[in-house]
UniProtKB/Swiss-Prot annotation:
It comes from Methanococcus aeolicus (strain ATCC BAA-1280 / DSM 17508 / OCM 812 / Nankai-3). This is Histidine--tRNA ligase. It is an enzyme of class 6 (ligase). Its main location: cytoplasm. Keywords: Aminoacyl-tRNA synthetase, ATP-binding, Cytoplasm, Ligase, Nucleotide-binding, Protein biosynthesis. GO terms for cellular component: cytoplasm. PROSITE patterns: AA_TRNA_LIGASE_II.
Length: 418
């Protein structure tokens, strides 16, 4: 017997129906905002996948060589592929380009609840606009999607330009800034404090209290931005970032958000507004993240292009929504006598119903009627059509509602009413 690879899953039909319902609801929201769906390859050149984060990503990827000895990798996320696609094919089209995707991704990490080696992402990229309303649109879109599927969540919104403005004002070296960024990204505040104290002693500066004032800022727009504008009044780039965040929030249509300047996701990647969404089930796991990344397309050797986007962790979303029943409207057609004439009529009626977009199954097991009804009841089929010779001669069929037990004769012309 073969087992599936570690960190992967099989989805039974009942689970796939639920996943497909949630997928389609989320996609409908992207399309309502006029985002267009695209698809990209499951594997890319390793050079592309490592461009954003460097060689360190290798141990997290599934890397292999093709028959031409070229190094490839299974995609760990979709944005790099979208950027490549944009630079190669879409850069000359009218702006903004509004793209969305839904695809499986792969990371070689230790499997645990809500974390797999194969997982699904759904997300979007809005390319070509630096207008604050573009930032607000992707935040609104992310919230609208989760509201569409009735998920209980909490959204935190921040701006990396505030911290970056502090770094710039103190004239830190590249290595010093990188060390601080990594500690913030890991939320290793104990070692961050030690690092900042050491910097203060070596450079005769006061930076620790400023950094922690930013990281600990959480609350409403008025509370956070008003307070930080006073603390950072001598840091022009930080003030510029706070003004930008304030303008973005004017266009965010709901107020059930938390301004959180402690968000430090992807300090090497994002350039401005960032946000994270946490589900309120399953230990408040993050289910969505995104922000502005105006330097990424240039990093991939394209022309400088402003960009903003986000991705849902689809598997975590499925863990965070309440279980629901899938409405089952399948129909089973059963010939009462097992002869070819009746079976052919069953197939003709099945085709007519399928043309009406009904989900129809014809009994393929030559079951007796009572066993066919038992089968329908076991697998959750909603209606059974029974076709007998006498009824057929009268242009009638018998139909049984498996939920209510009601059975009636109807004219063949009434098929569309089933």
């Amino acid at each position: 017997m073969f087992n599936r690879p570690k960190g992967t899953r099989d989805f039974a039909p009942s689970e796939m129906k639920k996943r497909k319902i949630i997928e389609n609801k989320l996609k409908s929201v992207f399309m309502a905002y006029n985002f267009n769906e695209i698809n990209t390859p499951t594997f890319e050149y390793f050079e592309l996948l490592s461009k954003k984060t460097g060689e360190d990503i290798r141990k997290q990827l599934f890397v292999f060589k093709d028959h031409g000895n070229r190094e490839m990798g299974l995609r760990p996320e979709i944005t790099s592929s979208v950027v490549r696609f944009y630079i190669n094919e879409l850069k000359n089209l009218p702006k903004p380009q509004k793209l969305f995707y839904f695809a499986n991704c792969f990371r070689y990490e230790q499997p645990q609840a809500g974390r797999y080696r194969e997982f699904w992402q759904m997300g979007c990229e809005l390319l070509g606009s630096k207008n604050p309303i573009a930032d607000a649109e992707v935040i609104n879109l992310a919230m609208d999607g989760l509201n569409k599927i009735n998920m209980d969540y909490e959204i935190h919104i921040g701006h990396l330009g505030v911290l970056k403005g502090v770094f710039e004002e103190f004239g830190l070296t590249e290595d010093e800034e990188l060390k601080i960024r990594r500690l913030i990204d890991k939320e290793d505040y104990e070692n961050l404090e030690k690092c900042l104290i050491e910097l203060e002693e070596n450079k005769n500066i006061i930076i620790k209290d400023i950094i922690f004032s930013v990281l600990n800022s959480k609350g409403t727009v008025e509370e956070v931005i008003g307070n930080l504008k006073e603390i950072l009044k001598n840091y022009p780039k930080s003030i510029e970032a706070l003004n930008n965040l304030e303008e973005i929030m004017e266009f965010v249509k709901r107020n059930n958000y938390i301004i959180n300047l402690g968000i430090a996701r992807g300090l090497d990647y994002y350039t401005g507004m960032v946000f994270e969404v946490y589900g309120k089930k399953e230990g408040a796991r993050q289910v969505c993240g995104g922000g502005r990344y105006d330097n990424l397309i240039e990093l991939f050797e394209g022309a400088p292009t402003p960009a903003v986007g986000f991705a849902y962790g689809f598997d975590r979303i499925m863990l965070n929504i309440d279980d629901f029943e899938v409405e089952d409207k399948r129909i089973l057609i059963v010939p009462i006598k097992k002869d070819k004439k009746l079976l052919k009529e069953c197939l003709i009626i099945a085709d007519k119903l399928r043309e009406m977009e009904k989900i129809v199954e014809v009994d393929l097991m030559n079951r007796k009627l009572n066993k066919a009804l038992n089968y329908a009841n076991t697998v959750g089929i909603s209606k059974v059509i029974m076709i007998g010779e006498k009824e057929l001669n009268e242009r009638k069929i018998s139909i049984k509602d498996m939920e209510t037990g009601e059975q009636k004769l109807i004219d063949l012309e009434e098929l569309s009413n089933i």
